């Protein structure tokens, strides 16, 4: 159609302020759920019908290391990233041939979000531009054979 993407990078995410689950304010918890799960679903619904129509495309839903493990004081974030893993794998089972959906753990990247959790220790991790040099070729190589696989940028 000319307007149908080959790849959708679905990277909506917020993280809660570090706190035990019972101390995370209800509104903050809801906002993390709304952005990290519902936001991802809205993007999928916006692009997937056109991709199905043309019979090709890859949806990359960004997960996290915390979508496959957990850590104290970020329970809401962990819960949403585990949800992205399951949501994406279920979506992959629903897709017609020629399409793919993958949950992608980008690895640890020096971002403001990471700084909110790790403080000055975040600076020991790669900058986004350094990460992109490795990730872009990896992501561009994704295709139908990767459908449903939990992948990581290493």
Locate predicted features.
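C-terminal helical subdomain
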Residues: 97-99, 103-104, 111, 120-154
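Active-site loop-to-helix junction immediately N-terminal to the catalytic Tyr of the SDR YXXXK motif
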Residues: 24, 70-78, 90, 117
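Residue(s) in the substrate-gating loop at a strand-loop-helix junction
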Residues: 64
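Substrate-binding pocket helix/loop in short-chain dehydrogenase/reductase
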Residues: 19-21, 28-30
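Conserved NAD(P)H cofactor-binding loop of Rossmann-fold oxidoreductase domains
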Residues: 12-17
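Active-site-adjacent segment of SDR/Rossmann-fold oxidoreductases
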Residues: 69, 90-99
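Active-site helix of classical SDR
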Residues: 44, 80
């Amino acid at each position: 159609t000319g307007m149908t993407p080959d790849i959708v990078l679905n990277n909506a995410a917020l993280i809660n302020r570090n706190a035990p689950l019972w101390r995370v304010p209800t509104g903050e918890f809801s906002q993390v759920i709304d952005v990290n799960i519902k936001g991802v679903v809205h993007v999928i619904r916006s692009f997937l019908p056109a991709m199905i129509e043309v019979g090709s495309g890859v949806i990359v839903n960004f997960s996290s290391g915390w979508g496959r493990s957990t850590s104290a004081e970020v329970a809401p974030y962990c819960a949403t990233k585990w949800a992205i893993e399951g949501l994406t794998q279920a979506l992959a089972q629903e897709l017609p041939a020629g399409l793919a959906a993958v949950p992608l753990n980008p690895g640890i990247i020096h971002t403001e979000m990471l700084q909110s959790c790790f403080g000055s220790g975040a600076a020991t991790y790669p900058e986004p531009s350094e990460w992109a040099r490795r990730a872009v070729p990896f992501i561009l190589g994704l295709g139908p054979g990767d459908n449903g696989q939990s992948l990581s940028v290493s």
